[in-house]
């Protein structure tokens, strides 16, 4: 992702190892230090599938695995997944993470709205086995950082859920504004999608702040913390059939 990289080792559909890296720290020394633990899986690694939205970072990690594991990485978007997922928009403009999220939920019968809380807050619309498009809104933490940078008297704030709409100090007012503001944004976008498409959807939340907003909607919401990596695994299994 733009902020963090999640690396998961799967065995029989179960995660046996999970590593999180900072995207802006990726270089050979950093990768050797943090990924050396994967060497015990070296001979068992059958396939490495990458879901990248930062091309330069992907190139460095791809070279690392080629050099130290003698294993090639494949980028999800470069694979032919047309029989797995029908893409109804310009595929070149879909981030690999959003594509992986869509692949993760498709079941050929239900409609889904996936909300991914990351650097951006993404909404993706999936009908049966088709990716129909989505909405991109500013990410919460990114917006908080920009507010602090642009407004001299606004401090850096670690975002927390607010129970009171009216804040009693600057920090509580900011948390209130962002929590209730984004709750309204999320609710309005989802209901607008439902109204415009005239369809029923299952709502899936994923990403770092997903649990915080789960109960802010009147609609039923399911949390899937490993949605993206599960989608990558599903694509890998499809290709190995």
Q: Can you annotate each of these PLM segments?
A:
Residues 51, 76, 114-120, 204-206:
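Short beta-strand segments
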Residues 18-19, 23-24, 162-199, 214, ...:
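Adenine-nucleotide phosphate-binding core of ATP-dependent small-molecule kinases
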Residues 1-16, 105, 109-131, 147:
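Gly/Thr-rich phosphate-binding beta-strand-loop-beta motif of the actin/hexokinase/Hsp70
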Residues 82-112, 231-241:
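Conserved phosphate-binding catalytic cores of ATP/NTP-utilizing and phosphoryl-transfer enzymes
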Residues 4, 51-60, 176-179, 199-216:
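Glycine-rich phosphate-binding loops at beta-strand->alpha-helix junctions
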Residues 70-82, 218-233:
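Conserved phosphate-binding/catalytic loops in two-lobed NTP-binding clefts
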Residues 103-109, 132-176, 235, 239:
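Glycine-rich phosphate-binding loop plus the immediately following alpha-helix
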Residues 2-81:
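N-terminal glycine/serine-rich phosphate-binding loop of ATP-dependent small-molecule kinases
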């Amino acid at each position: 992702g733009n902020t963090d990289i999640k690396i998961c080792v799967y065995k029989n559909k179960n995660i046996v190892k999970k590593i999180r890296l900072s995207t802006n720290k990726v270089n050979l020394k950093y990768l050797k230090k943090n990924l050396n633990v994967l060497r015990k899986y070296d001979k068992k690694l059958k396939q490495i599938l990458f879901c990248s939205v930062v091309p330069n970072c992907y190139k460095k990690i791809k070279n690392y695995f080629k050099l130290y594991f003698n294993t090639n990485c494949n980028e999800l978007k470069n694979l032919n997944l047309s029989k797995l997922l029908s893409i109804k928009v310009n595929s070149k403009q879909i981030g690999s993470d959003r594509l992986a999220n869509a692949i993760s939920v498709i079941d050929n019968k239900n409609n889904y709205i996936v909300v991914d809380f990351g650097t951006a807050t993404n909404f993706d619309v999936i009908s049966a086995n088709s990716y129909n498009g989505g909405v991109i809104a500013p990410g919460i933490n990114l917006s908080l950082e920009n507010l602090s940078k642009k407004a001299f008297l606004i401090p850096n704030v670690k975002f927390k859920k607010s129970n009171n709409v009216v804040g009693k100090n600057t920090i509580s007012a900011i948390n209130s504004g962002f929590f209730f503001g984004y709750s309204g944004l999320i609710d309005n976008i989802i209901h607008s999608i439902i109204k415009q498409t005239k369809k029923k959807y299952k709502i899936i939340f994923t990403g770092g702040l997903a649990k915080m907003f789960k109960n802010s909607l009147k609609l039923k919401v399911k949390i899937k913390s490993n949605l993206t990596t599960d989608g990558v695994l599903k694509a890998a299994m499809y290709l190995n059939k």
